[in-house]
Amino acid sequence: MRTPLAALFALSVLAVALPVAAALKAGQRAPNFSVPAALAGKTFGYSLAAALSRGPVVVYFFPAAFTSGCSIEAHEFAEAMPKFESLGASVIGVSTDDIDTLARFSVEACQSRFPVASDSGKVVVKAYDAQLAIRPDYADRISYLIGPDGAVIASYASLNPDKHVETMLAALREWRQAQPRK
Protein backbone atom coordinates (compact mmCIF):
# COMPACT_ATOMS: atom_id res chain seq x y z
CA MET A 1 0.00 0.00 0.00
CA ARG A 2 2.82 2.43 0.78
CA THR A 3 4.57 2.00 -2.57
CA PRO A 4 1.62 3.18 -4.71
CA LEU A 5 0.97 6.09 -2.34
CA ALA A 6 4.63 7.08 -2.35
CA ALA A 7 4.71 6.89 -6.15
CA LEU A 8 1.56 9.01 -6.42
CA PHE A 9 3.01 11.57 -4.02
CA ALA A 10 6.31 11.70 -5.96
CA LEU A 11 4.42 12.14 -9.22
CA SER A 12 2.34 14.99 -7.80
CA VAL A 13 5.48 16.75 -6.48
CA LEU A 14 7.14 16.32 -9.86
CA ALA A 15 4.09 17.73 -11.64
CA VAL A 16 4.23 20.86 -9.48
CA ALA A 17 7.98 21.26 -9.91
CA LEU A 18 8.08 20.97 -13.70
CA PRO A 19 7.11 23.97 -15.81
CA VAL A 20 4.34 23.39 -18.31
CA ALA A 21 4.38 24.60 -21.88
CA ALA A 22 1.97 27.35 -22.84
CA ALA A 23 -0.18 26.20 -25.73
CA LEU A 24 -0.44 29.54 -27.53
CA LYS A 25 2.82 31.01 -28.79
CA ALA A 26 3.79 34.63 -29.42
CA GLY A 27 2.23 35.91 -32.62
CA GLN A 28 -0.71 33.49 -32.56
CA ARG A 29 -4.22 34.89 -32.47
CA ALA A 30 -5.75 34.54 -29.00
CA PRO A 31 -9.25 33.06 -29.01
CA ASN A 32 -11.89 35.67 -28.22
CA PHE A 33 -14.28 34.92 -25.37
CA SER A 34 -17.19 36.31 -23.40
CA VAL A 35 -17.83 34.83 -19.95
CA PRO A 36 -19.42 35.65 -16.60
CA ALA A 37 -16.97 37.44 -14.34
CA ALA A 38 -16.82 39.09 -10.94
CA LEU A 39 -15.16 42.24 -9.68
CA ALA A 40 -15.49 43.49 -6.10
CA GLY A 41 -18.11 40.81 -5.47
CA LYS A 42 -20.39 41.93 -8.31
CA THR A 43 -20.97 39.80 -11.39
CA PHE A 44 -21.01 41.03 -14.99
CA GLY A 45 -20.40 39.84 -18.53
CA TYR A 46 -16.73 40.06 -19.52
CA SER A 47 -15.70 40.36 -23.17
CA LEU A 48 -12.06 39.97 -24.18
CA ALA A 49 -12.72 41.93 -27.38
CA ALA A 50 -14.09 44.87 -25.40
CA ALA A 51 -11.12 44.79 -23.02
CA LEU A 52 -8.64 44.66 -25.92
CA SER A 53 -10.25 47.75 -27.44
CA ARG A 54 -8.84 49.62 -24.42
CA GLY A 55 -5.34 48.11 -24.51
CA PRO A 56 -3.35 44.93 -23.86
CA VAL A 57 -4.81 42.30 -21.55
CA VAL A 58 -3.14 39.77 -19.28
CA VAL A 59 -5.28 36.63 -19.29
CA TYR A 60 -4.12 34.32 -16.55
CA PHE A 61 -5.54 30.87 -15.91
CA PHE A 62 -5.50 29.39 -12.42
CA PRO A 63 -6.63 26.00 -11.06
CA ALA A 64 -8.99 26.85 -8.18
CA ALA A 65 -10.03 29.82 -6.08
CA PHE A 66 -9.12 29.80 -2.40
CA THR A 67 -6.24 27.34 -2.79
CA SER A 68 -2.90 28.55 -1.49
CA GLY A 69 -1.08 28.98 -4.82
CA CYS A 70 -4.06 30.62 -6.50
CA SER A 71 -4.61 33.00 -3.60
CA ILE A 72 -0.91 33.94 -3.63
CA GLU A 73 -1.03 34.59 -7.38
CA ALA A 74 -4.24 36.65 -7.14
CA HIS A 75 -2.74 38.72 -4.32
CA GLU A 76 0.41 39.37 -6.38
CA PHE A 77 -1.65 40.47 -9.41
CA ALA A 78 -3.76 42.70 -7.13
CA GLU A 79 -0.67 44.35 -5.66
CA ALA A 80 0.77 44.90 -9.16
CA MET A 81 -2.38 46.40 -10.70
CA PRO A 82 -1.09 50.00 -10.50
CA LYS A 83 1.94 48.92 -12.58
CA PHE A 84 -0.23 47.14 -15.17
CA GLU A 85 -2.59 50.12 -15.36
CA SER A 86 0.28 52.60 -15.75
CA LEU A 87 1.34 50.60 -18.81
CA GLY A 88 -2.21 50.68 -20.20
CA ALA A 89 -3.03 47.02 -19.53
CA SER A 90 -5.82 45.20 -17.76
CA VAL A 91 -5.85 41.77 -16.11
CA ILE A 92 -8.45 38.98 -16.04
CA GLY A 93 -8.09 35.73 -14.13
CA VAL A 94 -9.89 32.65 -15.49
CA SER A 95 -10.74 29.40 -13.71
CA THR A 96 -13.34 26.66 -13.88
CA ASP A 97 -14.82 27.71 -10.53
CA ASP A 98 -18.47 28.75 -10.40
CA ILE A 99 -19.30 32.46 -10.47
CA ASP A 100 -20.49 32.58 -6.83
CA THR A 101 -17.12 31.27 -5.62
CA LEU A 102 -15.31 33.75 -7.85
CA ALA A 103 -17.46 36.65 -6.61
CA ARG A 104 -16.10 35.98 -3.12
CA PHE A 105 -12.57 35.39 -4.46
CA SER A 106 -12.69 38.72 -6.33
CA VAL A 107 -13.03 40.50 -3.00
CA GLU A 108 -10.92 38.35 -0.68
CA ALA A 109 -7.92 37.33 -2.81
CA CYS A 110 -8.10 39.83 -5.69
CA GLN A 111 -8.78 42.73 -3.31
CA SER A 112 -11.43 44.08 -5.73
CA ARG A 113 -8.64 45.26 -8.06
CA PHE A 114 -9.24 43.07 -11.14
CA PRO A 115 -11.95 40.70 -12.37
CA VAL A 116 -11.96 36.91 -12.36
CA ALA A 117 -13.98 34.91 -14.87
CA SER A 118 -15.89 31.67 -14.56
CA ASP A 119 -15.32 29.13 -17.30
CA SER A 120 -17.24 26.31 -15.63
CA GLY A 121 -17.96 24.76 -19.04
CA LYS A 122 -14.21 24.77 -19.81
CA VAL A 123 -14.78 26.39 -23.23
CA VAL A 124 -12.11 29.08 -22.78
CA VAL A 125 -9.73 26.71 -20.98
CA LYS A 126 -9.94 24.29 -23.91
CA ALA A 127 -9.62 27.06 -26.53
CA TYR A 128 -6.37 28.15 -24.87
CA ASP A 129 -5.31 24.51 -24.30
CA ALA A 130 -5.02 25.43 -20.63
CA GLN A 131 -6.41 22.30 -18.99
CA LEU A 132 -4.38 20.89 -16.14
CA ALA A 133 -3.01 17.61 -17.52
CA ILE A 134 -3.29 15.68 -14.27
CA ARG A 135 -6.76 17.12 -13.45
CA PRO A 136 -8.58 18.11 -16.68
CA ASP A 137 -11.52 19.62 -14.75
CA TYR A 138 -9.16 22.39 -13.64
CA ALA A 139 -7.31 25.11 -15.50
CA ASP A 140 -3.53 24.99 -15.58
CA ARG A 141 -1.52 27.96 -14.32
CA ILE A 142 -0.73 29.82 -17.55
CA SER A 143 -0.48 33.56 -18.18
CA TYR A 144 -0.79 35.29 -21.54
CA LEU A 145 -0.17 38.88 -22.55
CA ILE A 146 -2.47 39.67 -25.46
CA GLY A 147 -2.01 42.77 -27.59
CA PRO A 148 -4.82 45.10 -28.66
CA ASP A 149 -4.72 43.40 -32.09
CA GLY A 150 -5.64 40.07 -30.45
CA ALA A 151 -2.23 38.46 -30.94
CA VAL A 152 -0.35 36.75 -28.13
CA ILE A 153 2.64 38.89 -27.16
CA ALA A 154 4.03 36.57 -24.48
CA SER A 155 3.13 33.55 -22.41
CA TYR A 156 4.37 31.95 -19.23
CA ALA A 157 3.40 28.56 -17.87
CA SER A 158 4.34 27.19 -14.46
CA LEU A 159 2.30 25.66 -11.67
CA ASN A 160 4.44 27.74 -9.31
CA PRO A 161 2.67 31.11 -8.95
CA ASP A 162 5.83 33.08 -8.09
CA LYS A 163 6.93 34.45 -11.47
CA HIS A 164 3.68 35.03 -13.38
CA VAL A 165 3.26 38.68 -12.42
CA GLU A 166 6.89 39.71 -12.95
CA THR A 167 7.07 37.82 -16.27
CA MET A 168 3.91 39.50 -17.60
CA LEU A 169 5.08 42.93 -16.42
CA ALA A 170 8.48 42.48 -18.09
CA ALA A 171 6.83 41.40 -21.36
CA LEU A 172 4.40 44.32 -21.17
CA ARG A 173 7.23 46.83 -20.60
CA GLU A 174 9.20 45.38 -23.51
CA TRP A 175 6.14 45.49 -25.80
CA ARG A 176 5.30 49.05 -24.69
CA GLN A 177 8.86 50.24 -25.44
CA ALA A 178 8.65 48.77 -28.95
CA GLN A 179 5.46 50.70 -29.75
CA PRO A 180 5.76 53.86 -31.84
CA ARG A 181 5.42 57.04 -29.82
CA LYS A 182 2.20 58.97 -30.39
Annotate the PLM regions.
Residues 34-56:
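A short beta-strand-turn-helix
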Residues 138-182:
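Thiol-/selenol-based redox modules, centered on thioredoxin-like
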